[in-house]
Amino acid sequence: MKLQLMEIDAQTACVPARGKLDFLDLGFVNHCLLDIRLIGVRSCCPGGFSSYVLERNGRARGLGISLGPESGGECFLLEKRLRLRYEFISANIANYQLGPALFESSFLQPLPEGFNDGAFDLCLLDAVPIWQEQKSKGWDGQRLFLSQFILALKGVKRGGTIVIRLSRPELLYTARILWILDRVSQELRTCKPLTIHAKRPSFYAVAVGVGLGVEASRLPAIVDQFQRLWVELTFGGEEGEGRWLEDVDFDFLISQDDLIDTFADRLIDLSRSVWVVQTQTLCRLVSASKKQPTREMWRRTSSVLTCNNVSDAILYQTIS
């Protein structure tokens, strides 16, 4: 994980080497289960990303949130010599009250004392679910993503940076996240580290100057809408145990038609480096297997040519 952030930083300069730096690391909060009414959740504690930031910047101070061993999680992995500048909170982020201010539930806890709105210069979001078949629900991964995104939007300082792991930029779901980050930030860049992610659909978006973009005035309302959606994903559905994210749920950001009309070219610019890395990696894998790739094969295997969820227009521009 340390090598991944090193690659990202080398391309985007997202981790300053000097000056005061307060950061939030949810990158190792890997919950296999987000149903807050069940127990036995495992997680991997903050380590690699935090270690890189603390070593790079001697004035950096961090906050990491994850389950500890007493709750079924893993041991705290950060080097002991760095822990004086780091606060670790043993908790499940899905147990926090991430809905609107007036929403109440006996299942939820207030945000920890170490977390304050607008407190962090840098927010690192790399959480992915580790599934347990008998307990996890299909939408738990979507709830996990939304939970960490809400924490980042609330926690980042005006002018701060968000580094977030996403998947397949051509998907409507992902494209809308890229759109809002692009609109509320001064600069948005994408990066696909060769470490681990080269042949996977995952990549990272780095939003610099969050709160200084052309749509920055919308941020409070956007956070409120995400919080309302979080309640729906957590307690909605026919049985009141949550539901899947639907395409229309992000319409409050931008409609699909407007996204295509106004963001297609920008989306392709942001996605090109991601697609190039993955395509080159897949080419090497195919060459190593001594098989000749066909166009139809790339349609099935490469995210470069499987963007059928945004629009035919974006697909056409991407292939052309």
Task: Name every feature range the model reports, one short phrase each.
Residues 1-37, 55:
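Class I SAM-dependent methyltransferase Rossmann-like catalytic core
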Residues 4-16, 196-320:
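C-terminal lobe and adjacent flexible extensions of AdoMet/dcAdoMet transferase-like proteins
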Residues 25-31, 40-47, 67:
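Class I SAM-dependent methyltransferase "Motif I" SAM/SAH-binding loop
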Residues 42-43, 114-134:
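Conserved proline-anchored active-site loop of SAM-dependent methyltransferases
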Residues 60-68, 90:
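Conserved SAM-binding motif I beta-strand of class I
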Residues 67, 71-73, 136-141, 177, ...:
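Class I S-adenosyl-L-methionine-dependent methyltransferase catalytic core
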Residues 135-189:
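Conserved Class I SAM-dependent methyltransferase catalytic core
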